[in-house]
Every structure is written in C-alpha cells, then in structure tokens.
Amino acid sequence: MGLFEKYVSNLNRLLILTMVFAVICAGSTLALGVKKGIDLKGGTMVILKTEKDPDTVTSEASRILGVSDVEAIRSSQGDVIVQVPKYLSADDVNKLARAVGGEVESVQTIGPALGRVFWESVKVAVPLALVAVSIVVFAIFRKPLLSAAVLGALALDLVDALGLMALTGVPLTLASFAGLLMIIGYAVDSNILLSMYTVKRRRVRRVDRAIADSFKTGITMVATTTAAACALFLLSMSEAMFEIAAVVIFGLIADVLNTWIFNAWVIREKIAGR
C-alpha cells in the first residue's frame, strides 16, 4: 500500500487529529486573544534603529511616555518596532529615540476613530466573503452537504489560523487580514479541486482512488505555495509582508488538515453512503 493509499485508509484517525487541533486553536484564541495592530485599534508605531533589546526599549518607552501597554519587537531587518496605543508628538518620539540611543527610521500614526472604522470594516468583510463563497459553492454543486462541508473547512481554516496567530503573537492588522482573505480564496480552490475530482467518480469502489489522486495534486499546490510564502517570510523587508507571509503559512497548515482530512472524510462518507 502506497503513501497516498495509507492516507485515505486512515482518514478516520486523522480526523480526530484535525478536530483536536481545531479545539486547541479555538481555545488559544479565546484564552490568549489575537492582538490588534495599531491600524485597527489606533496608536503610533515607531521604527527605531537601536542596539538596545526590545525589552529595554519597552521599559524605557513605558517610563517616558507614561503608558503601560507598550509593545516592542525586533524586525527581520534588525530595527526595533515600538507600538504605543496613543498619539505621540514629535517631541515624544525624539525623547524615546534619545532614551534608547537610537535613530528614528519612520513613524506611523492611526487615530482611534480611523482604527475603529477599519475594525468595523474587517468585521463586515469576513462574513460577506463567506456568504459570497457559499453562494458560489452551492451554484457549482447544488448539493447542500458538499457545500456545507466546503464552508465548514473554510471556517476551520480561519479558526486554526487565528489560533496560531494568538500562539505566535502575530497581530491582526490590515496586512494580516489580507492574509486571512487569501486563505479563504486558497481554501475555496483546494476544496473545489477535491470535491469536483471526487464527485465525478460516483461509484463507491473508486472513491478512495479519486481522493488519493486529488490529494497528490493538492499537496503539490500546498508545497509550492508554502515554499513561496516561506521565502517571503524570511526575506521580507516590510512588516506588512512579514505578517501576510506568516498568516498564509498558518492557513496552508490549516488547509491540509481541513480540506484533505475533514472535507475528504465528509466526501468519502457521503458518497459511500449513497
């Protein structure tokens, strides 16, 4: 028995792994929460060129600015990115730079009102995207169970991606939100690939073979997309590109579980039961 045949024969066991992973990710999201970036909650982001470590910069920023909720991380370019949940004047920024012996590379400020507008837009965009996908999927298949399975896989992809964001500290920003929308688009493609390839082979004795064959194509897509996303993750010169790459990688991990295990199991059981 080959590798792909073993994969199909063990779908029942793999489904347990998929569900456990989803529960862990959902729990992480609820317990830890996904941090919102300044473009969604408002505030100031300062990029400093300094040799001081992020912890030192955080403590200095809190002391000078009188704000406790300060975050500082080292970027892939070696700069320190400081996020402060309030408006900073030019004097505030210069004081911070002098305190840590650094130079100001850039400053980005988002007002609280604009941040709320962005956040409200995000909360509307995701449900609209899922509704649009549900209409398209149902129009293609005209099969409620298959359509529900695809939408279930999409929802699990988002749950898993948000959980991994919570665990790794990747914030929810406009950039990472774009990554989440990319996940929806990619997941629709992979689920339709699986569903179309398998539904066309209706006879029960061919279902496992159809799933295994479609998995070969799907896992090749995952491998090539992951390679591109990892290159962007490692070599990106922009924080936005870094966040997009991270979220896409999380989504690809989730899609392997939710398309090629969860949805494959639903399709096999649906066809086998006819």
UniProtKB/Swiss-Prot annotation:
The terms describing its cellular component in GO are:
plasma membrane
List this protein's GO terms for biological process.
intracellular protein transmembrane transport; protein targeting
Quaternary organization = Part of the protein translocation apparatus. Forms a complex with SecD.
Q: What does this protein do?
A: Involved in protein export.
> Which family, according to UniProt?
Belongs to the SecD/SecF family. SecF subfamily.
Name of the protein: Protein-export membrane protein SecF
| Location in or out of the cell | Cell membrane
List the source organism: Methanopyrus kandleri (strain AV19 / DSM 6324 / JCM 9639 / NBRC 100938)
